[in-house]
Amino acid sequence: MRRTWLRSAALRRGTVCVGPRARFLRASRAMSMDGELQKHYALLLGIGSPWEVKTVALKLAAKEVEIELGWQWGAAAQCPECGGPCSIHDRAPERTWRHLDTMQFTTLIRARIPRSQCPEHGVKTMAVPWAAPQGRFTLLFERFAVDVLLASGSVSQGCELMGIGWETAQEIMRRAVERGLERRQLEGLKHLGMDEKSFKRGQSYITLLTDLDQSRVLDVVEERTVAASEQLWATLTAGQKQAVTAVAVDMWAPFIQTIEQQVPGADIVHDKFHVSKYLGEAVDKVRRQEHKELMAQGDETLKGSRQLWLYNPQHFSAEQAAEFSALKDLHLKVARAWAAKELFSKFWAYQSEGWARRFFKDWFGWVSRSRLKPVIEVARMLKRHLDNLLTYLKHHITNAVTEGLNSKIQSLKAAARGFRSFRNYRVRILFFCGKLNLYPL
């Protein structure tokens, strides 16, 4: 009796050898558990015939789960080109795909994909249900990565959360943008915007084409030349360009020339924010010239007043408002320049083209007699483009949407600490600002 009890205790501790029958039972239980684990991962992956989970290996040291998938030989094969039935030629070398993590363990899928022998298309690597052709990630991982990158404050933060490198993230975004551009519908475009954005140091620019109604970037090209502008418009079909009714743009000659050639039926609308910028720069030139003259006489009246002349008085503090009011009463040249700028803002409120023309004529006459050269130069430029200023009264569009997207693009550039490659810059802009359908099917 005591011998039986000791043997049972030893068996529980695993300190004695067991017989063939016990070893067989243990192996059977292990095989049963492996089978259940394989079924479990097959369900998680959505894998079914003719594919099956062959093995699941847990690598604790590497913190990885490795899943091997296999093709059930004898199953019907299809050509990836035409979808027709065909025979199996051979198997391609083993490939690995990154999948969603399992309990914080990196999960990898391994498989040798069969290659089909099609009478029409020859030998082709067959498509797999868990990943796109030539992809290095499963469809589920790519979808997750897109969500994380869009939600993260920066790409580097998204990379850290997913445990991937910058180049991997860039590749995921590139593939997502390619998918999005292929699916994008551009019918019904009406109001577009064109604007420039600095790319690198010096005179290096990119040109953006934006859909003002949908607040999205349609495409980006390098430089701001006529050729670059034509390249942008070439992304639209003749029918899409014909539907465009107006384009908001500044007074950059290559942009105007290209719009007139590519979309002759659309009105050019010179953006009121750019006009305000030109007038603001003229006011600042007058201030700097007058400040220099006053300082030569020992007068520091305009010292430290730059922001007061450029910013909206509605946002002034009580102290700033009092200081600005006192400066305006001193009959300074810069005060007259500022008054000309503020007066022109009334132009945009007119509903009648005739009354707007009359206002501009009066404003232009007053400015011409002001003897303020920087303001006069801007007034003459506005007169040359008056017809395209008046189109605002018809369409009421501005490049405010484009400017808002420019701010977002600037934040992308700052987060990346600049871009050496325009290709990567374009992918990043379209990924975050293109409103594309980025997800894999």
Name each model feature, range by range.
Residues 72-76, 111-114:
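Short metal-coordination and nucleic-acid-contact micro-motifs, chiefly zinc-binding Cys/His arrays
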Residues 275-296:
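Short alpha-helix plus adjacent loop in nuclease-associated cores
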Residues 17, 23-33, 76, 81, ...:
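Acidic/histidine-rich catalytic cores and adjacent linkers
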Residues 29-66, 71-74, 140, 161-246, ...:
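Long C-terminal interaction/binding lobes of large macromolecular proteins
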Residues 128-132, 242, 266, 290-295:
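Short, polar/flexible loop-turn hinges at active-site or ligand-entry regions and domain interfaces
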